[in-house]
UniProtKB/Swiss-Prot annotation:
InterPro entries: HDA1_su2/3_sf, Hda2/3. Gene3D superfamilies: 1.10.287.1490, 3.40.50.12360. GO terms for molecular function: chromatin binding; DNA binding; histone deacetylase activity. Its main location: nucleus. This is HDA1 complex subunit 2. It is found in: Nucleus. The keyword Nucleus applies. Residues 457-625 form a coiled coil. It comes from Eremothecium gossypii (strain ATCC 10895 / CBS 109.51 / FGSC 9923 / NRRL Y-1056) (Yeast). One of its GO terms (biological process) is chromatin organization.
Length: 665
């Protein structure tokens, strides 16, 4: 597999770091800062950083462990190895192997959540495995740094729709998968379909069983088959054979797990496998290894996907073309680049989901490579930033808001045991600080929840009180409205009584005036005369009013009669309109149209037939006239009658005996 050729495909996927990985990296840097500056930095830099180093134990305690101190070169080599392990997965920082039961019982989501590289790998595997299953199954190779990393990968890959085969190390759980080559599997499937022995139903009640036992033949048999048709070639039988072959076909993908060391020492590792895609968690994987070149014989191009942490030491060496064999010669530049640029991981989220989906699509469709090293180049380091300042600051350390925590630079020298002990203590202290921070945040959240609950309770009380006040206000408004209505009625009654009182006062004044006057009789007489005059004027008015009342009654009666007649006509008109609408709908409906079309066609047919009969009559009339003129026929009716009598006499029968059958003469 030549990834440098024209048909080769190289994919470079940068990833970020999780909070746990960033904290562990800061702990490692504070452990190795002194040794890193002691080997690569100037002496004044060491003196400058010595003021910031906190002494936590005496040299006598280190010597009491019984092991010699580690040299700065060994410490820096360990730093590079540990940074690489943490960048892959935090669990790889442990020197011993993970227990098999722990990896089998640990939820895969927790293993994935610890590492950003594992999260991206899981997204890619989910996208690959969730594609259309009708396609050709893929054979994937996953290359890692170590066997421990393969154990973690197998731990969260178990249970997925893929067959896992460990090429390096011991499998956590042997699923007993047997690998067969694609050509061999296809040949076996074809031979199965050709022979048909595995798909035939040879039971005595089946057609195949009767045919095989000789019960079915050309003639009638006991089984009831009367023909010589070969039922093995029926459509139902062939469809059942196709379904059985499809079920026997292997649609599950294969995942082969190997390490870089195994690839280096085993040149024929992939000779018996038809590899489609190579996924490498080791960005420094040498593509010129014989194990990878052995796949070059294939006609197809096998893409290689490399996952690396952005601005890591491996990213630096990858862009500079430094191989894994010469990484110790460039350890200062690589680790120094990561130390100075590790702060950019606070804003970097790695490759977006859309870009990752494009990469997976390109892998499945065998398209051109979408990523290269130019698009994922390392971050430019500021020239004014010194390595001492970069080591002194805890840039990537997650800030704790409620728990005091400091991570000072650690002083050496360290032996192997003291180094592991100190590293474990720092990790444990950080874990305790994070747990206290979590407890403080949980307490803060619970306190806020209690406050919000109290606020909601007070709000409910305020709402209830507002409801009561609103109800009382409505009741008072109702009382006010009733009072206003009673006041209005009282005012109306008061005005009416006041007018009545004023009228009575006027009448009283008039009566008093009449009683006090001296000419009472003359005034009474004048009033009576006026009353008689008014009565005389009232009589014609009453007669006129009576006549108008009679006229109004007559007009009212006439109006009622005409209104009733108009209502009757209106109802009749409405019914006629409904009838018209129904008839219109019926006339324009499909049944009426069809009947009208049929009647029209029948009329046309009858008219054509009538025309034909008229023409035939004219023809016969002309023919008769012609025959009369040719043969001098004068009376056709007499001729017809004579012929009819002759024919009747010829076919008459006479009964001469008592026999039951007549005798014809």
């Amino acid at each position: 597999m030549n990834f440098c050729s024209k048909n080769a495909q190289m994919y470079y996927i940068p990833v970020g770091l999780t909070s746990l990985q960033k904290d562990l990296i800061e702990i490692l840097l504070c452990m190795h800062a002194e040794s890193f500056l002691e080997e690569f930095g100037p002496s004044e830099a060491v003196m400058q950083s010595a003021a910031q180093i906190k002494t936590e134990k005496e040299p006598e305690a280190v010597e009491g462990l019984g092991l010699g101190p580690l040299t700065p070169t060994q410490m820096n080599t360990m730093l590079l190895r540990h940074l690489r392990a943490v960048a892959n997965h935090p669990c790889l920082l442990v020197d011993h192997y993970m227990p098999r039961k722990f990896l089998l019982m640990e939820p895969g989501e927790e293993l994935i959540a610890m590492s950003e590289k594992f999260r991206v790998l899981n997204q890619m595997m989910e996208a690959i495995l969730s594609r259309r299953r009708r396609q050709r199954p893929l054979q994937l190779v996953l290359v890692s740094h170590s066997v421990k990393e393969l154990d973690l990968i197998e731990g969260f890959m178990l249970g997925k729709m893929v067959k896992i085969k460990r090429l390096s190390g011991t499998s956590l759980f042997d699923e007993k998968h047997q690998y067969t080559e694609r050509g061999t599997a296809a040949a076996e499937s074809n031979s199965t379909l050709t022979s048909g022995s595995t798909l035939k139903d040879t039971s005595p009640g089946s057609v195949e069983g009767k045919l095989s036992s000789g019960e079915a033949g050309a003639g009638y048999t006991t089984g009831g088959i009367k023909d010589d048709y070969d039922y093995q070639n029926s459509r139902r039988h062939m469809r059942a054979a196709d379904d059985g072959a499809e079920r026997q076909c292997d649609h599950e993908d294969w995942l082969f797990l190997a390490t870089t060391t195994h690839l280096t020492h085993c040149t024929d590792l992939f000779d018996q496998y038809d590899v489609d895609v190579v996924l490498s968690l080791d960005p420094l994987l040498d593509v010129s290894l014989p194990a990878l070149r052995s796949v070059r014989k294939q006609s197809k191009s096998v893409p290689l996907v490399k996952l690396f942490v952005q601005d890591s030491a491996e990213h630096f060496m990858l862009t500079r073309g430094i191989s894994a064999e010469h990484e110790e010669d460039h350890i200062y530049d690589a680790v120094g680049h990561f130390i100075k640029n590790r702060g950019v991981h606070r804003q970097r989220l790695g490759m977006s989901a859309a870009a990752l989906a494009e990469v997976v699509t390109a892998l499945l469709e065998n398209c051109e490579a979408a990523t290269d090293l130019k698009s994922t180049k390392p971050t430019d380091t500021p020239s004014e930033l010194s390595i001492v300042d970069a080591l002194s600051e805890r840039i990537m350390l997650l800030k704790l808001n409620h728990t005091p925590y400091e991570l000072p630079l650690q002083r050496g020298p360290f032996s192997m045991k003291s180094y592991q002990l100190q590293l474990k203590q720092l990790i444990y202290a950080r874990l305790e600080a994070c747990q206290r921070e979590q407890e403080c945040k949980c307490a803060y959240i619970l306190d806020r929840r209690m406050q919000e609950t109290a606020n909601l309770n007070r709000l409910d009380e305020v709402n209830a009180e507002a409801g009561r006040l609103f109800q009382s206000l409505k009741d008072e408004e109702k009382l006010v409205v009733d009072s206003e209505r009673r006041l209005e009625r009282t005012r109306d009654e008061h005005d009416r009584l006041r007018e009545k009182s004023a009228h009575l006062r006027r009448r009283k004044a008039e009566l008093e005036e009449l009683l006090a006057s001296s000419d009472l009789d003359s005034r009474v007489s004048s009033k009576r005369a006026r009353l008689a005059e008014l009565r005389q004027q009232l009589m014609p008015l009453e007669q006129q009013n009576t006549a108008m009342a009679d006229s109004n009654e007559e007009l009212r009666t006439r109006y009622q009669t005409r209104s009733s007649h108009a209502a009757t006509l209106s109802s009749a008109l409405a019914s006629l309109r409904e009838r018209k609408a129904a008839l219109t709908k019926e006339s324009t409906g499909p049944a009426t149209c069809w009947m009208a079309a049929s009647a029209t066609e029948e009329h046309d047919r009858l008219q054509t037939e009538l025309n034909d009969l008229v023409q035939q009559r004219h023809f016969l009339q002309k023919y008769i006239d012609t025959m009369k003129s040719q043969y001098a026929i004068t009376n056709l009716d007499e001729l017809n009658r004579t012929q009819h009598n002759k024919s009747g006499a010829a076919t008459s029968r006479v009964r001469t005996t008592r026999a039951t059958s007549p005798t014809y003469i």
